[in-house]
Amino acid sequence: MEAGPWRVSAPPSGPPQFPAVVPGPSLEVARAHMLALGPQQLLAQDEEGDTLLHLFAARGLRWAAYAAAEVLQVYRRLDIREHKGKTPLLVAAAANQPLIVEDLLNLGAEPNAADHQGRSVLHVAATYGLPGVLLAVLNSGVQVDLEARDFEGLTPLHTAILALNVAMRPSDLCPRVLSTQARDRLDCVHMLLQMGANHTSQEIKSNKTVLHLAVQAANPTLVQLLLELPRGDLRTFVNMKAHGNTALHMAAALPPGPAQEAIVRHLLAAGADPTLRNLENEQPVHLLRPGPGPEGLRQLLKRSRVAPPGLSS
C-alpha cells in the first residue's frame, strides 16, 4: 500500500493541510501519525469543506483513511460533509475505492447518506458503473436502502439503467460486444437486482419503470435481461404504464430497424398486450411510423391482437 514516513508538524489552527508525504506501510503506522496530528487537525475543514479523511478517501490512501476515520468515529463526525454534501463514504465511492468504502461502512458510516443531489453510495456506483463499490457495500453486510430516490426521483436501479443506455451503442445487440464501460455498468444492473432492487419501481417524473427506460433507449440487450428476471408477475410488469404508455407503445414508436423489431418481439413473447390503449386511445400498432419498414411489425401486432392469450406468454 502506501509507503514512506509522514512528516508531521504542529497542528495548524486553520484548514487541514494535506501532508507532503503520506503514511505508511501499515495501519499501526497510520494510527501513530493520526495520534500525532490530533483531533483538531483531523476535524478541521478546508474552504471546500474537505477534511483529511475526505482527501485520504479521494486519493485511495486506505490505512490513512482508516486511522483518520477511527478518530472521527469517536467524535461522531464520520459523516461530516464537504461543500457538495458528500460524506467521506460518498467521496470514496466516487473515487472507486471499494476497500475504503467497505472500511467506512464497517466503522459505522451512514450507508444511506446522500449528497446535495440526493445521491446515495448506490446512486454514485450506478452513475459511474462501479461494480466493485457495490460489492463492497454488499460485503459490509449493512442494511442499505435500495429504493432510495435522488432529487430526480430515480432509484439506484433507474440510475444504473440510464448510465448503461448512455454507454451502449445502438448496434450493441449482444453483451459479448460491449465496451468495458458498458460491461461495468451492466454488471451494476445485475448486482443491484441481485441485492434486491425492485425492478417494478417507477421513477417519479413520468412513472417509467426500468423496462420503459430500456425500451426508450432502443436497448434490446437490456430489454431481454429485464424480461428474464425470475421473480414477480412478468405479464403485469411488461404491461405497466408510464403516463398511459406501456413498454410496447414505446417500442412501436421507435425508429424502424433491427433494434425496434427485436424489442417488440421480446415484449410480445413476454406477454405484452397489444390491445391496451394509452391516454390518447392509441394502441401500439397506431404508433408505428409510416413506410414499408415497419410493415412486418404492423402485421405482427395485428395478429397478436387476435391470438389467444396463452400464445403470448
UniProtKB/Swiss-Prot annotation:
The keyword Repeat applies. ANK repeats lie at residues 48-83, 84-113, 117-146, 152-201, 206-236, 243-276. PROSITE patterns: ANK_REP_REGION (PS50297), ANK_REPEAT (PS50088). InterPro entries: Ankyrin_rpt, Ankyrin_rpt-contain_sf. GO terms for cellular component: nucleus. It is found in: Nucleus. Keywords: ANK repeat, Inflammatory response, Nucleus, Repeat. Its main location: nucleus. Pfam families: Ank_2, Ank_5. GO terms for biological process: inflammatory response; positive regulation of T-helper 17 cell differentiation; regulation of gene expression; T cell receptor signaling pathway. PANTHER family: ANKYRIN REPEAT FAMILY A (PTHR24124), NF-KAPPA-B INHIBITOR DELTA (PTHR24124:SF7). Belongs to the NF-kappa-B inhibitor family. Interacts with NFKB1, RELA and RELB; in the nucleus. Regulates the expression of IL-2, IL-6, and other cytokines through regulation on NF-kappa-B activity. Functions in the regulation of inflammatory responses. Involved in the induction of T helper 17 cells (Th17) differentiation upon recognition of antigen by T cell antigen receptor (TCR). May also regulate TCR-induced negative selection of thymocytes. This is NF-kappa-B inhibitor delta. The lineage of its organism: Eukaryota, Metazoa, Chordata, Craniata, Vertebrata. The gene is NFKBID.
